[in-house]
A protein has these predicted regions:
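Rossmann-like NAD(P)(H) cofactor-binding subdomain of soluble oxidoreductases
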Residues: 52-144
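Residues at the starts of beta-strands that form the adenosine-phosphate
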Residues: 2, 25, 106, 126, ...
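Rossmann-fold dinucleotide-binding core
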Residues: 110-195, 201
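NAD(P)+-binding Rossmann beta1-loop-alpha1 motif at the extreme N-terminus of oxidoreductases
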Residues: 1-51
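N-terminal glycine-rich phosphate-binding loop for ADP-containing cofactors
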Residues: 200, 204-222
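Short phosphate-binding/catalytic loops that engage adenosine nucleotides
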Residues: 24, 43, 125, 180, ...
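Anion (oxyanion) recognition and catalysis
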Residues: 20, 121, 176, 232, ...
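NAD(P)-dependent Rossmann-like dehydrogenase/reductase catalytic/cofactor-binding core
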Residues: 217-333
Length: 333
């Protein structure tokens, strides 16, 4: 199998680099300065066991690869707000022997949130969800770090519509040769909804900074209470905190230090967009559909989007000001 990593940022480059180290055939898909750096200097990937430079083929789109191969695996690691453009571009790519990628090739959605699987299922016949537990950092072109140990990350995977198949097992085997644990599960979306609850704090970190603070923890708990209530009202199951702890404890330990997460990194790089619509916004959507007020998540989504649109630096708001906005929104309910 050849792995085409669509979005070679923090997550994509780490998975792609680790797969390449283990002998898998990999193509990294990137754009702009990052693509130029990867082509010129290679991928500089730092993990717990050191720094290596990987010379991996780089493409900016499907046209550069010509006909895709029947054994290609598409790993979608762009942020959800960029998923439609990527799915449309790659879905129409022709595959040797006839048909398109959307008709014949598997696409794995390795992203935060739960919307990309739904977007992919509108276009692709073979869609897999991946619940990504892989703290990684991408702040400058061509350079990525993922410092967890003893494993680089844990990647639960399965069919997005439920169930698992032999292909998932083969992909998992490649990942497990590459520094990951990759449990194949029948209910991958249940794991992704649980991860969604954890990601509700991304907007807090992005707007007020990554440093721990009791008021930030309190705001996250309020957002998670709304999230759990919305999931219950919608009849959506999610893995418990105990299940997640059992799956991860002692396997993906981060070294000491404060690091910004994916949303913080988006603001730091000045990308102009942020994934809050598909994290806090997912809870807002479910709340409106099922009669559950979500003022804290509404506030966090709105604040994060203002930061992204206006190019504000991460951490430019005090947690006191953000909490006051959430309190005002809650008082209006």
């Amino acid at each position: 199998m050849r792995y085409i990593i669509i979005g070679a940022g923090a997550i994509g480059a780490t998975i792609g680099g680790r797969l390449a180290e283990a002998g898998a055939e990999v193509v990294l898909v990137a754009r702009g300065a990052h693509a130029e750096a990867l082509k010129a200097d290679g991928l500089r990937l730092t993990t717990a066991d050191g720094t290596r430079v990987h010379r991996i083929p780089v493409a900016e789109g499907p046209a550069e690869l010509g006909e895709l191969r029947p054994d290609d695996v598409l790993l979608l690691t762009v942020k959800t707000q960029d998923a439609i453009a990527a799915l449309d571009a790659w879905g129409d790519a022709e595959v040797a022997g006839g048909g398109t990628a959307a008709q014949r090739l598997p696409v794995l959605c390795a992203q935060n949130g739960v919307e990309s699987e739904r977007l992919a299922l509108r276009r692709f016949a073979r869609v897999y969800g991946v619940c990504v537990w892989l703290p990684a950092t991408f702040l400058e072109p061509g350079v990525v770090s993922a410092l967890c140990a003893p494993l680089t990350g844990i990647l639960h995977l399965g069919l997005a519509a439920g169930g698992a198949d032999a292909r998932a097992g083969r992909i998992a085997a490649d990942l497990e040769k590459s520094g990951f644990e990759a449990p194949v599960v029948e209910d991958v979306m249940r794991w992704k909804y649980a991860k969604l609850l954890g990601n509700l704090g991304n907007a807090v970190q992005a707007t007020t900074g990554p440093e721990p603070h009791p008021a930030k923890a309190a705001l996250l708990l309020r957002a998670q209470r709304e999230g759990r209530a919305a999931l219950v009202a919608a009849g959506i199951a999610h893995a418990s905190d105990e299940e997640q702890a059992a799956a991860r404890d002692g396997k993906v330990e981060q070294p000491p230090g404060v690091r910004g997460g994916s949303s913080w990194q988006s603001l730091h790089r000045g990308t102009g967009s942020i994934e809050a619509d598909y994290l806090n916004g997912e809870i807002s959507l479910l709340g409106r559909l099922h009669g559950v007020p979500t003022p804290v998540n509404d506030t966090l989504r709105h604040a994060a989007n203002i930061f992204a649109r206006e190019g504000l630096p991460p951490g430019a708001m005090s947690v006191e000001d953000l909490t006051a906005l959430a309190d005002e929104a809650s008082a209006r309910v």
